[in-house]
From Swiss-Prot:
InterPro entries on file: Yos1
An example Gene Ontology biological process: intracellular protein transport
Protein family per UniProt: Belongs to the YOS1 family.
One annotated Gene Ontology cellular component of this protein: endoplasmic reticulum
Subcellular location: Endoplasmic reticulum membrane; Golgi apparatus membrane
Assembly and oligomerization: Component of the yip1-yif1 complex, composed of at least yif1, yip1 and yos1.
Designated gene of the protein: yos1
Protein name in the entry: Protein transport protein yos1
Species of provenance: Schizosaccharomyces pombe (strain 972 / ATCC 24843) (Fission yeast)
């Protein structure tokens, strides 16, 4: 019923959602913008700071792989339905 392919689709959709988050429009409203981040030397391993680092890492590292993976998934769905 809920197969491996569906899990991959959900993962891809969640990565896309994180990749397109706007820091000014969404994250800034809840106080999670770049300006609200910690300065140099202030290292706190709070859950909020870890989530912010994860969001920034996904947006930085996964941009081009997500473009390629999305293209492959679109072509796959067009060809095989």
């Amino acid at each position: 019923m809920f197969g491996f392919g569906n899990i991959l689709y959900v993962t891809l959709l969640l990565l896309n959602a994180v990749a397109i988050l706007s820091e000014d429009r969404f994250l800034g409203r809840i106080g999670w913008s770049q300006s609200a981040a910690l300065g140099f030397g202030d290292r706190q391993d709070t859950i909020k700071s870890r989530i912010l680092h994860l969001i920034r890492a996904i947006r930085t590292v996964m941009t081009f792989p997500l473009i390629a993976i999305n293209t492959i998934v679109i072509v796959y769905n067009l060809v095989l339905g």
